[in-house]
Regions:
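Electropositive polyanion-binding surfaces
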Residues: 2-387
Length: 387
């Protein structure tokens, strides 16, 4: 790991002046900080993250409305409130550009005081956030949206595995004595693809127990019974997210579901285990609402809109991240390759029709020995994201 840090010039420490500037930021939220913010502290709010996550940068809030619809809030940490333009911390963040995630560590863009504390949406702590709030029907119709600065107090920190348990059990989970912490924590370390040594399994169990103890300080308590209202929120949001996802693919999104390979290393940085991280419905739930928020904000800025009845002018300049249409030559190569296995695929120039054709090919090849190779070629035919 040290050689990677050296090869790419990754700064694993912050200069004292940057650390001092971050440490000088107050942990307390004052009335001045709350001015102009919508208050969501009494609204049911939670995060869903990997079980070993240390920084929680987004959260969902959920509230049933009297008209039968739901208010769903997508909240992210309001980093810009703490990191002011031109400050020492701002200049350092610009120089770094991004956080870099290695197998055994993270090289953060911001000092720990910000990334893991002030701007981490930890449970039972008031946090300043920027939010996209939607009124949504049970059939995922967007009635209205609002964007602005808020304050939240997360009630619960879910691991993906725990949220997935609720989804898997469906309505039965409402009557079950599901408990946070233990199952979610251990699920991620009990599904190895490859064990590099006989001792790895025992080591994984020991480390999971250590993570479990550490998580007690982050709001995930061993044996903590998950309240019914939280389970209801997860199930309702899962239903809405499923409709949003189906609608997105019908509109031309392409489904790539390659499992991510994860490597576990020991204290000396040596690999001891390789396992698959498979994306499930709990991951899709978060993904769909993040996409909804991003897309809605982009549409609002691009076309102009109304917030609280006041028309906003469309921004003349804004940064969008988009994917161009697939490379036709590479698509032709994919068609030829797939044809060797008996598949036929049209290659229309229209982007949406091409997306439908690609999804059809991937669906037809699903669970076949050649699927992985076809999916890789399909992925390579995609254009890189541009700004």
């Amino acid at each position: 790991m040290h050689s990677i840090l050296a090869e790419y010039g990754l700064p694993y420490r912050f200069e004292p002046e940057v650390e001092n500037a971050a440490d000088s930021i107050s942990d307390k939220i004052t009335e001045k900080d709350l001015k102009g913010r919508k208050d969501f502290r009494d609204t049911l709010t939670f995060t869903i993250d990997p079980e070993d996550a240390k920084d929680f940068d987004d959260a969902l809030s959920f509230r049933k409305l009297e008209n039968g619809n739901y208010e769903v809030g997508v909240h992210i940490a309001d980093v810009s409130y703490y990191v002011t333009p031109g400050s020492v911390v701002d200049k350092e963040a610009q120089a770094r550009g991004t956080s870099v995630y290695l197998v055994d560590r993270t090289v953060p863009m911001l000092p720990e005081k910000l990334s893991n504390k002030l701007c981490s949406l930890r449970p039972n702590e008031e946090k300043l956030t920027f939010s996209a709030v939607f009124e949504i029907t049970p059939l995922a119709g967007i009635v209205s949206s609002w964007f602005g600065r808020t304050v939240i107090n997360s009630n619960y920190r879910f691991a993906y595995e725990t949220a997935q348990q609720i989804i898997d059990n469906g309505e039965k989970s409402l009557e079950m004595d599901l408990r946070g912490g233990t199952d979610g924590i251990h699920a991620a370390v009990k599904d190895p693809v490859l064990e590099a040594s006989p001792e790895a399994a025992a080591r994984a169990e020991h480390e999971a127990a250590g993570r479990s103890e550490a998580m007690m300080g982050a709001g995930v308590y061993e044996g903590c019974v998950i309240p019914r209202e939280l389970k209801e929120a997860i199930l309702t949001l899962h239903k809405i997210a499923s409709i949003l996802r189906k609608r997105r693919f019908a509109a031309g999104a392409i489904s790539f579901e390659r499992p991510e390979m994860k490597v576990e290393v020991d204290e000396k940085g040596r690999p001891v285990r390789v396992y698959q991280k498979i994306s499930k419905e709990a991951n899709w739930l978060i993904e769909e609402f993040m996409l909804l928020a991003n897309r809605s904000v982009a549409e609002f800025i691009a076309t102009g809109g109304k917030m609280n009845g006041v028309a906003k002018k469309s921004a003349k300049t804004f940064v969008y991240r988009i994917h161009d249409e697939p490379n036709q030559e590479k698509v032709a190569g994919l068609r030829t390759f797939a044809g060797n296995f008996g598949y036929t695929m049209e290659a229309p120039e229209d982007g949406r029709k091409l997306a439908k054709a690609l999804n059809g090919l991937l669906a037809e090849a699903k669970n076949k020995p050649e699927f992985s190779a076809i999916e890789i070629l399909a992925l390579r035919s995609m254009a890189k994201a541009c700004y």
